[in-house]
C-alpha cells in the first residue's frame, strides 16, 4: 500500500524549540499523534511519500534526529523538499548521511521517479501560484523560480515516462509541496506540464489552518488533493490504485 502525508514539521532534536503547537489545538502533541497514527496504519512493506516541510532543522547535521525519527516509523519513505526544509542538501550528501547514520528506509524524490507497487512517483517542490501571493518572499525572481521548478518537474516526469514504457500498467502520480492551484490562483507553467504528461492525480501540502477549505477537487481532468498533516489528523492517507 502507498500512503502520502506532507508537512511533518518535526522538531525532535534536544534544544530545538520550533513546535507547531503554537498554531492551534489541532497541532497539540502532534509528533506523538503522528507516531501513533502512522504506526497504526502503515506496515513495514508499505510506502509513504512525504512532500516537504519535513524538519525545522537549519542544516543537514541538525536534521539527524528528525531523520532517525522518520526512519524508525514503519514503511519505506520517499521524501521531497518543502519551503521550510533549509536543512536539505545535495542528494549525494544526504545519501552519505543516511549511510553513515544507518538510515535505511528513507529515499529521495528529487529529480527522479521511484517505482513503488502500482505507481511511478514523480514531482517537485513547486512554487507560489502567483508573484503577488501575500506570503511569497520579497526580492525573489518569481519567473526564474517557476522555470527552475518546471525543469525539475520535467526531469522527474521524463524518468517516469520511461518507466511507464516498461511498466504500462502503472500510474504516474505527481507530488508537490506547494499547491499548483489554490484559492483562485494558478501556477500555469507547472499545470501545463502535468497535462502534457497526462497526470491524473496530484498531491500537495503547504496549506495549514483553513480547515473549511476543500481537500480534494478536480480541475480539467486532474484531481488535486491536499495532504498536509494537520488536514489528515497526522495519519498518512492511502493512495488506492483506482482514482481517489
Residue map of PLM features:
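Extreme N-terminal starter segment of soluble prokaryotic enzymes
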Residues: 1-3
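Residues at the C-termini of beta-strands that transition into short coil/loop
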Residues: 6, 81, 112, 125, ...
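Active-site glycine-centered loops adjacent to acidic/histidine catalytic or metal-binding residues
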Residues: 7, 52-53, 82-83, 177, ...
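Conserved catalytic scaffold of divalent metal-dependent phosphoesterases
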Residues: 8-13, 90-185, 243
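Short active-site segment of divalent metal-dependent hydrolases/proteases
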Residues: 10, 55-56, 180, 209
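Short N-terminal binding/cap micro-motifs at the start of the first secondary-structure element
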Residues: 11-16, 234
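Core catalytic region of metal-dependent phosphoesterases/phosphodiesterases
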Residues: 16-116, 186-197, 221-222, 226-228
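Conserved beta-sheet core of the metallophosphoesterase superfamily
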Residues: 78, 180-244
